[in-house]
Amino acid sequence: MDYQPNNKALPAGSLGGLIGNWLNNNPWLRDESIIKGVYKDKLTASLDKADKNINSTVSRKLLNGDRNIENIASLLDNWVDNHPWAHGGWVPGNVDWDEFITNLDQSDAGANPIQQVREEIMELVRVLLETVSGKTAVEIGMGRCGGSHYLWSLMFDRVVTVDVDEKLIERFKYEHMPSSKQSTFIFGKSFENNIADEVGRATHHCDFMLIDGDHSRDAVETDWRTYNHLVEPGGIIAFHDTIKVVPGELEVAGFVQDLESGAVTGNPVPMRHIHKSKFVGISYYTV
């Protein structure tokens, strides 16, 4: 990626100096040409102008020619390979649900930095890069490590995330310092009216939505009915875990099938499926 380095020295004791030291010594920022280069220059450029809290100034979004699938894949691989505490790698695509659950490591160290199969999520990234503007993304459910929020922040000006676990949100904010201008986190149950109202205040519309919260059939339908109106024409609504139905555990596929057949609204919804694994999968449609 091409970028213009900022060579202006920052005093060692300044906020900029401290952040530069953090970037240089952070164990999981390994790709210097992409992460340290781009983000450190963004940080120092902003902090040269004003000594502000980093959370209020710096967007992770890749701009212009840098916003391509190769750079996003490289950054996401770095996220997975060098996460500070979650070392479970990508979700495996070649195992079935029963085997996955039997061998699941519930510890922090065993967590997947992003709860996705690589081939599936990168195919969705390709679709998004080709079809949507990259203005605003809304996701219902952020996962244990916030990997999907991190991914969308590379691609969109604004990312609004709703999750029921406040501790996960606060941990992500503490560890990764997302820009408050780019990232909005809403804590609560997505189906509650006050949470839906808060999402509506955060953004009146979006060009991408991922529904990946409670995986019960009724909850998925409620999330879809509550939030689908936010997605503008030409935008994309995606669902995660759409291959396998496991009663009481994975019921997203049942709703997606009903939506596709017309059983939900009376009109069939043309659905595209990214199914490159045994039990995970992503399905989406264009509004």
Sequence positions of predicted segments:
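A short alpha-helical cap/connector motif
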Residues: 1-210, 214-287
